[in-house]
A protein has these predicted regions:
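N-terminal regulatory/effector-sensing and dimerization cores
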Residues: 1-32
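An amphipathic alpha-helical interaction segment
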Residues: 18-20, 38-107
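Basic/polar phosphate-binding segments, predominantly the helix-turn-helix DNA-binding elements
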Residues: 75-81, 101, 105-149, 162, ...
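Conserved A-loop
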Residues: 158
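PLP-dependent class I/II
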Residues: 200-201
Length: 207
């Protein structure tokens, strides 16, 4: 935020997405966004509170800053969707009037035995039109997106300590071996090896 008398003020944030570079939200964002505040009038009250909180030493300061940055990120994403400035991926798919219904179904009930036909029906499109539109807008096939979304959930549940047997059922896989095959195809490692790697990465990142 800038002031002609006092100059510019900066607040920096580091946002970590689950799955790192494989996160569908992170993949859809442009590498750099520079916007004047005049284009985001709804952000001004939130940013004013954010800057005040950043410069204060109040109780609960970090929790407040985390939540305020989340609000700013959501407002920024909405603005980018309106401008059509996002890359092919989750955000452009959610902005599509028909594809968003299929994406919402995948997100809400990933364990369902989704097929191109059933997803196309939710989108109100024919199978072929849906498959082509999905690939063009989201940047991958419906089956590819479904698997990546499921594996992202599997990674989250592994970190939470859930047993692989329950994870397989919740993620829509018929068995642990079926999940392990899909996981290795996506991540290059077995679920167990991936978890060990992530735990070591977390230890290495500690100061």
């Amino acid at each position: 935020m800038t002031d002609r008398e006092q100059g510019a003020e900066f607040v920096c944030a580091h946002i970590v997405f689950e799955g790192h570079a494989a996160n569908p939200l992170a993949n859809a964002l442009p590498s750099c966004v520079c916007l004047p505040l005049a284009t985001l009038p709804d952000c001004v009250p939130v940013l004013t509170l954010l800057f005040a909180e950043a410069q204060a030493t109040n109780c609960g300061r970090q929790v407040m800053l985390d939540r305020l940055f989340e609000v700013v990120l959501i407002q920024l994403l909405r603005h980018l969707m309106e401008l059509g400035s996002t890359q092919a991926g989750l955000i452009t798919g959610l902005a599509h009037p028909q594809l968003r219904h299929a994406l919402a179904a995948i997100h809400q009930t990933p364990a369902q035995p989704w097929s191109v036909e059933s997803l196309a029906s939710l989108a109100g499109m024919s199978r072929s039109v849906f498959a082509n539109q999905f690939r063009d807008v989201v940047g991958e096939t419906p089956a590819g997106y479904l698997q990546r979304w499921r594996i992202g959930l599997v990674q989250k549940w592994l970190k939470n300590g859930q047993p692989l047997r329950l994870i397989a059922e919740e993620a829509g896989y018929s068995s642990e071996p079926a999940l392990s095959r899909a996981f290795k195809s996506q991540c290059g490692l077995s679920p167990k090896a991936w978890l060990v790697q992530e735990q070591q990465r977390s230890l290495d990142a500690r100061p």
